[in-house]
Amino acid sequence: MPCKRCRPSVYSLSYIKRGKTRNYLYPIWSPYAYYLYCYKYRITLREKMLPRCYKSITYKEEEDLTLQPRSCLQCSESLVGLQEGKSTEQGNHDQLKELYSAGNLTVLATDPLLHQDPVQLDFHFRLTSQTSAHWHGLLCDRRLFLDIPYQALDQGNRESLTATLEYVEEKTNVDSVFVNFQNDRNDRGALLRAFSYMGFEVVRPDHPALPPLDNVIFMVYPLERDVGHLPSEPP
């Protein structure tokens, strides 16, 4: 019996899957404790009628990993991050887009099309023509968690944090900025004094916005917002 159907049928399905998975290169209290991923799948079905009416079906699936966590050789307070950052820094940098640049501060963020909760933000502050200070953070539910850079008490890092806080206050709708460090650090007292001087406050361990961790000190910089406040350039 001849086949009445001569044209091939093509069916295509595309969908995006987002989520996070544990990044064991960083401790659980770090903003980079999880990989953020965004997979794009495309499944194509081709149906072709052969002389005896048998079906030939082909499936094609494409997977695109579009987002991974940042690891920076210059910036990470984690020793593992310092060791591993060199090999991944360039690849991760390519996944960030410039969001803002003025004076010595440049802000990078994940692709706006991939924005989800949380969102990755990087703050680069130029100190000289060849050096810069970096603060890497995750924006989650109007809270910004900053990773403390290596040698956080250096004058350059303090200047860069001031510029970062000014940007966050003026250009975003963030309500609180968090930093954290180990309770048993040798420079714990110096960190407490330095961040307190800049307006940070120690957060109680049972604060609902924090993970239930031991031996970790969280400090928060609260931003007082006026009613009806709208950021001029939201991330």
UniProtKB/Swiss-Prot annotation:
One of its GO terms (cellular component) is cytoplasm. The modification Phosphoserine is found at S9, S12. GO terms for molecular function: ankyrin repeat binding; ornithine decarboxylase inhibitor activity. Gene3D superfamilies: 3.40.630.60. Belongs to the ODC antizyme family. Ornithine decarboxylase (ODC) antizyme protein that negatively regulates ODC activity and intracellular polyamine biosynthesis and uptake in response to increased intracellular polyamine levels. Binds to ODC monomers, inhibiting the assembly of the functional ODC homodimers. Does not target the ODC monomers for degradation, which allows a protein synthesis-independent restoration of ODC activity. Stabilizes AZIN2 by interfering with its ubiquitination. Involved in the translocation of AZNI2 from ER-Golgi intermediate compartment (ERGIC) to the cytosol. This is Ornithine decarboxylase antizyme 3. It comes from Homo sapiens. The gene is OAZ3.
